[in-house]
């Protein structure tokens, strides 16, 4: 992933896994959350640690008013503080959850809005203690903690030993992915893929669900 192409999260709260619309064409524009899927099945998350540089640190300061995590960044020092990138890793499980009955309204909405995106990675600042907890985990999942709220579930040796609420983090960047649609064997329009922002849908799949429907109807003639 090219993390320099992340959108910056300044004015609106962003969370991993939410759905919405990007306002404007520039990477500093706003993201409007329009749907919050329910993830009854946990979605695996990839964890990557990165060193702050001047650009990412300044972006963090804009998002975290008052440097709430007390991160000390000095250009001249070789040792730099770290932030974390979380990325939804299991796209198959993600699509399956969105198509479950408990997300019927969300699925109907994204079918009707071809510009709808889903936040599939975030850059966030957390305490050094929580970074160490993430390091200790065998695997990390995104899960629902309460109605329309998410948290991270940290698993070691098959057992959840800690959860982290996003309220304890400062998200300062995010990337979006988009939905591709196709006709299935039952001649229904279904999710085919979730692709990165600058990618294109594969052959016979479409960003616009209506176009997939038109294509299906054409071949019925």
Predicted regions and their residues:
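An N-terminally focused, membrane-permeabilizing/fusogenic/translocator signature enriched
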Residues: 1-80, 198-221
């Amino acid at each position: 992933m090219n993390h320099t192409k992340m959108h910056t999260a300044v004015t609106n709260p962003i969370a991993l896994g939410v759905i919405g619309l990007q306002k404007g064409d520039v990477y500093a524009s706003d993201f409007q959350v329009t749907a919050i899927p329910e993830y009854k099945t946990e979605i695996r998350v990839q964890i990557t640690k990165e060193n702050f540089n001047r650009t990412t640190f300044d972006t963090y300061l804009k998002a975290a008013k008052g440097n709430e995590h007390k991160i000390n960044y000095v250009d001249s020092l070789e040792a730099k503080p770290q932030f974390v990138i979380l990325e939804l890793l299991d796209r198959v499980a993600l699509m399956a959850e969105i198509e479950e009955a408990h997300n019927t309204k969300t699925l109907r909405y994204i079918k009707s809005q071809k510009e709808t995106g889903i936040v599939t990675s975030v850059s966030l600042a957390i305490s050094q203690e929580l970074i160490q907890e993430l390091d200790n985990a065998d695997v990390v999942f995104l899960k629902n903690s309460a109605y329309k709220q998410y948290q991270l579930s940290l698993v070691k040796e098959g057992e959840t030993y800690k959860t982290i609420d996003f309220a304890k983090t400062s998200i300062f960047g995010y990337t979006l992915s988009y939905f591709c649609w196709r006709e299935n064997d039952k001649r229904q329009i279904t999710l085919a893929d979730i692709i990165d922002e600058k990618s294109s849908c594969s052959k016979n799949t479409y960003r616009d669900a209506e176009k997939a429907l038109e294509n299906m109807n054409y071949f019925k003639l």
